[in-house]
Amino acid sequence: MKKNISRLTYIGVTLSVLTGVFSCDKTIEEPQRVGYTPASVDEKAGAWKTYLLASAEEISVPAPTAVTSSDYVAELSALKGLASNLSQEQKEAVVYWGAGAVYRWNEIARELAARYNIPPASNADGKYPVPDAANPLADPKFPFANPPYTSRALAYLSVAQYDALVSAWNFKYKFKRSAPSKVDASIPAALPVSALPSYPSEDAVVAAASVTILKAMFPGEVPYLDAKLKEHLASRQWAGMNVTSDLTAGTNLGNAVAAKVMGRARTDGMGAANNQALTAGMIEAAKSRGIKEPWLSQEGPARPPMLPNFGAVQTWNFDRKTLEQIRPVIPYVVGSAEWQKELDELKSIQNKQTREQARIANYWADGAGSYTPPGHWHRAAANAAHEAKFSEIKMARTLALVGTAEMDAGIACWETKYYYYTPRPQQFGLKTSVGLPNFPSYTSGHSTFSAAAATVLAYIFPDQADKFNAQAQEASVSRIYGLIHYRIDCELGLKHGKVIGDYAIARGKADGSGL
């Protein structure tokens, strides 16, 4: 990476020239964002509790050269000489990445999730081929970024970003190297310069950690991710924000932290999440619990159920025993008077669906080609943090709390779904226009994901609690309006999600941030 950085030609530009210009090809429309001076630089964040690093100093970072040294003076001279005559494309890159490293890499991850959220089609033999991580661009492409997969990808991304930034903050305030423009006022800074020390570069830390995780999660996108990494690092010198040694130290730290995070990912049980050999036993176990009519795929040909063993994947904020203890009890089953009442409610909606009900069902559908409910809530979290002018590390903390809650919600919900294996309304003649999920009904994934995220966001942004909770309620009821869930699936999914969110909050309250 050092060689790549040193070979780039960098030039700078003032922020007044850059305002309003962006450079990213987006398949999903996102709000335009620009850089800001954070409300707080969170100078004590190097002491915050990490998820996987034993301490903020587990990975060593060498001390930088003094700002009076000949080596650093040479770096400043190179930066100054390159900080002029930017091309329009370079100007656009400065503004795009200046909106925030954590913000942009989360956005990129969501776009990749949407791009890969396409279920495999059946072949001529009536079989559904399984995407192959070793050949990710073959048909069907790997991964199928369904809600559980996306929740996991975003969780690992956010944890890597957060742990890497906690370590970076520790070394920033240990070494206290000032930003280049504060050492040499003749260097034009094209983005807001805060009191945050520059070594190691927070942007390089986030970029390197993010690319390592995303290459593992989306292995067919390696050239694209390498290009984004190169552009991000270059933009920091085009903007006059970092010298090469800032970037090199940050890149090395981000790579090392991400390698540790991927160590967990390789052993968390995801490799067995699609074990279809387990489904026969799951169905028999569900029958022993009173489920007389288990779920059946309504696709033709019948599609194997989505990730039946995702419920066995390792959680973040509670252990396996707790997962089983908080599993919702199913209050009634197919054939009961209570179930019939809920089926009749769906039939009534099918016959007399209002425009508002249809709008809500479609707005929250988050089906194929979208970044799914976990991505929807990550976007809400990132936007709220950006609007609040959070520092990079506080933004990363926000997304790590939401991300781990969302992955835990996916695991706990999927464990519940295959524990009870209940049929969807479509097995009893109802139709849907929002896409029919290929897995059991109870409980609602949308409800569980949404309540978990809204609970965490209400803790982080208490002045917006009512808004987030109302959105979770709407996301939940959207599945009733879409005719793919019974009311009990949604109501108990919401309760389950809130409990899961509360575990993430407990972790947040104990992380040393005082937030």
Which ranges hold each PLM region?
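Acidic/polar surface patches and capping/hinge elements
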Residues: 25-515
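C-terminal motif of bacterial Sec signal peptides marking the signal peptidase cleavage site
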Residues: 19-23
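Bacterial N-terminal signal peptides that target proteins for export
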Residues: 2-11
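Hydrophobic helical h-region of N-terminal Sec-dependent signal peptides
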Residues: 13-17
